[in-house]
Amino acid sequence: MQARYSVSDPNALGVVPYLSEQNYYRAAGSYGGMASPMGVYSGHPEQYGAGMGRSYAPYHHQPAAPKDLVKPPYSYIALITMAIQNAPEKKITLNGIYQFIMDRFPFYRENKQGWQNSIRHNLSLNECFVKVPRDDKKPGKGSYWTLDPDSYNMFENGSFLRRRRRFKKKDVPKDKEERAHLKEPPPASAKGAPTGTPVADGPKEAEKKVVVKSEAASPALPVITKVETLSPEGALQASPRSSASTPAGSPDGSLPEHHAAAPNGLPGFSVETIMTLRTSPPGGDLSPAAARAGLVVPPLALPYAAAPPAAYAQPCAQGLEAAGSAGYQCSMRAMSLYTGAERPAHVCVPPALDEALSDHPSGPGSPLGALNLAAGQEGALGASGHHHQHHSHLHPQAPPPAPQPPPAPQPATQATSWYLNHGGDLSHLPGHTFATQQQTFPNVREMFNSHRLGLDNSTLGESQVSNASCQLPYRATPSLYRHAAPYSYDCTKY
C-alpha cells in the first residue's frame, strides 16, 4: 500500500513521515485524488454491510434456533421415565411431566397438543407406568404417575436411548426366576462348599485315571499322555505321581526302563520328540537340583518332561555298547542342531540353565545328567571325555570304556557332516566351555576370539577334546545350514 500510494502521489511522502501509518492514512485521506477512491471503497463496505445487516439480520438467529429445536433422540417412554425419576418422590402428575419435558427440551415448547397427546397415550398403554391415586392431604388436580418397581432395568445401563424390550407384567415372574437363577450360584457355592469339592475332584480323578491307563498300556513311556486339559491344580497334584512313576527320578533306577525301550522298537529320534524337547525344558521338575538351580518349568510341561529321556536313552545306550553306533551319532548331533548348537553363544539358553550347568559340572547331582539329555548333547558335540564320564556314571555295571571312541562312528559322522558343519565349527568349543563348564563369554567379541583361538591351537583342542579326529571332517566341509548356528561365517577362511 505504501509503495503504491507513494508512486501515485509522491508529495504525500514529503508531508507525512514514512513509517507512521496513522498519519499517513490521515494525510492521504485529505487529498482530493485519494479521497474519491477511498470514499468509493469505504462507502461500498458501509453500503453492503448495512444492507446485509438489514436483509440478513433475521436469519442470523435462525441457525441457532434449529439447533435448539432439533427433536431429542429419546422416545416418549424415556421422556416420561426421566420426568418420574427426577421427581422428588419418584411420582409426578401429568402436568408435571409436561413441564419437565418443556423445561428440559425446548423442542417440545411448540406443538404442545401433538406431543402431549402422545404422552398420555404412552402413559395409559405401557404397563411400566402405574397410576397412583392422589391423597386427600395434598390438594390438586390429577393423579400421580410412577414407575413399576420391576421396570427400573427397562433401559440398558441407565441409557435412555436404548430400551431392552417392551415391559409387560406377565413377564415379571419369568424375570424374577431368571434373576433368582443368576443370584443362586454364589450363595450355593459359599454354603455348599463340601458339596462342591467332590464335583471338582471328579475331573481330577478322571485325569489321574487317564494317566494310570497310559502307564499300564506302555510301561516304557510312563507319562507320555498329552493331557492338555490339565488345570494347574491338577498338574500340581499329578506332579508327585508322575515323579514317582517316572524312572528318571533316580539315575540308577533309570537303567531298566531305558533298556526296556529297545525291545519295543521305539524310534529314538523323531521330529515330534525334537519339537517337544525344544518347547519343553529338558528335565522338568523331576530333580530337586533343578529347583535349587532356579529352573522355572511350567506345570503343564510335566507330562512331556518324562518322554524325551526314554526316547533318547536307547540310542545313547546303543552308542556305547552296540557296534553299530551310527544311529547314536546322527541322533545326538541332529539333536544338537536344535538344542545344543546355540549353547556356545549363550543366545537361546536361559541363564538359569547355564547356572544349573555350572553349578553341577558332572556326576549324579546334575539334573540334566540324570535325565541323560544335556550330557549326551555335549558329548556329541565333542567333549567325549565328559560324555563318557556321564555314561560311566549312568551304566555302573559296564566297564568304563577307553577315552578314544570306537572307529565305527567316524564314517557315519563324515557322512552326516554335510548338514552338520556347524557342529564341526562348534565341536571344539564344548571342550572349552562344557568340559570345564565354568567359563562363560562376557561379550560377543571374546566369543569369536575364543573361536579363532580354538581353531589355531588344534593341540589344545586335542588335549581337552579327546576326539580330535571327529573334528577334522566337520572343519573341512562347507556348511549347507549356516543359519542354524548363531554365527554364520565359514571357519575355513580363518
Swiss-Prot record:
Modified residues (Omega-N-methylarginine): R278, R292
Pfam families registered for this protein in UniProt: Forkhead (PF00250)
GO biological process per UniProt: anatomical structure morphogenesis; apoptotic process involved in outflow tract morphogenesis; artery morphogenesis; blood vessel development; blood vessel diameter maintenance; blood vessel remodeling; branching involved in blood vessel morphogenesis; camera-type eye development
Modified residues annotated as Phosphoserine in this record: S214, S218, S231, S239, S250, S280, S287, S366
Entry's Gene Ontology cellular component terms: nucleus
Single GO term (MF): sequence-specific DNA binding
Cross-link for Glycyl lysine isopeptide (Lys-Gly) (interchain with G-Cter in SUMO2), residue positions: K183, K213
Basic and acidic residues: compositionally biased ranges: 170-184, 202-212
Protein name as it appears in the record: Forkhead box protein C2
Species, as recorded: Rattus norvegicus (Rat)
